[in-house]
Amino acid sequence: MRDIFIFSAIICIVLAALRKPQVGILGWLWLSIMNPHKESYGWIYSLPILDIIAGATLLSAVINFKQAKKALFHPIAIILLIFYLWTCLSTLFAISYDLAFPRWLDHTKTMMFVCLMLLFLNSRYWIISAIWVFVFSVGYTGVKGGIFTLLTGGGARIWGASGTAWGDNNGVSLAMLMVIPLIFALKELLDRKILRLGIYGSALLAFVTILGTQSRGGLVGILGSGLVFFIRTKHKFSIGILIILTGLAVLAFMPDSWKGRMQTINTYEEDRSASTRILQWKYAVQLASESPIIGNGFYARYHQPFYQKYMVGIDVNRAVHSVFFQILEEQGYGGLFLYLLLMVLAMVSANRVAKKAINRPDLKWAGTLLYYSQFSIAGFAFNGLTINVGYIDLYYYILAFVVLLISHINIELAKPISENTNQKSLGK
């Protein structure tokens, strides 16, 4: 029954996408993030549904290109493009093409749909629709995981959608840190109190899910995001009290197993997992020295001659456990500079442009979404200190939302006041 339902939904998306590529883009967002067919264990489990959606969407984008409404030029998009071209260069000169090419191909697919988002979703309706799809696809796990954590007293770990880049417990904590700010921002689109309460409840359950993952990176992400929010907010006293009360509630609710695991952050010398990460970070720096400018290409650390040279007798060949060291070893210092520049520029631009829009009644929704999106990026940055997800699609979708929201706000601010008033009266 589940197989039939999912397959029927895919058929509907494909048919609608052939007329409107925007529908195909939303379908891709839903399926690539949530992977609902992996929740079924029937014949649809192995069906290449993402390829089907991608094919229909690309065909429609070519046929219906007149529907494109390109986002305005912004440095974020340019740096994002340059970084992608940099990954192409590092792949071309990769130390192991067989290792690098499959991962480069996955990243290319993500970037292709980011480009389609910037081409076809530059309107209020489609921006809001895309963010709702993103929030639903990630938030589903947050609500389900939060309820499970409460029922089990936090004694079991939460895992994400099967077959996705955020399927393990660390990935779930990262996804929740990125979606919680957007959940809060969506309250501006809801008038009824009961719906707003639902938003707050969903955000709370997503937060509980982070705790339920028992991810130390998740705790680092919570602390880092909380610090950024505290710095940005004007209500520092009330937010400070809320943070303290939340911390006390967490300590009271979570079991000793969770507390013991989190305490190993301070005693990394005695913790095998934490000390291993330091060895892997050192290995990343050593790899970067092999090709410091353009890097060694995707998955270079698994190139056995490198492992034999630097790690034999020291540690096994593990993941790098850091976004930034991952980018360093694979894309070099040049790639890391572009990556950090992109991250900082996105946060600064989101905060700056949001302030222009948040006091405009017709743009408050966009300003609020843009303002909170910077905390999604902050959550990614802090949690990314401990996990290697430098190319995860969720992050690039957030960057696309930032560019689209900035574009929409700047377009509306450039219009004469009378025109904005007329559009508001017409409900546009």
Question: What residue ranges belong to the model's regions?
Answer:
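Alpha-helical transmembrane segments of multi-pass inner-membrane proteins
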Residues: S8-A17, L80-L92, T108-L116, W126-I158, ...
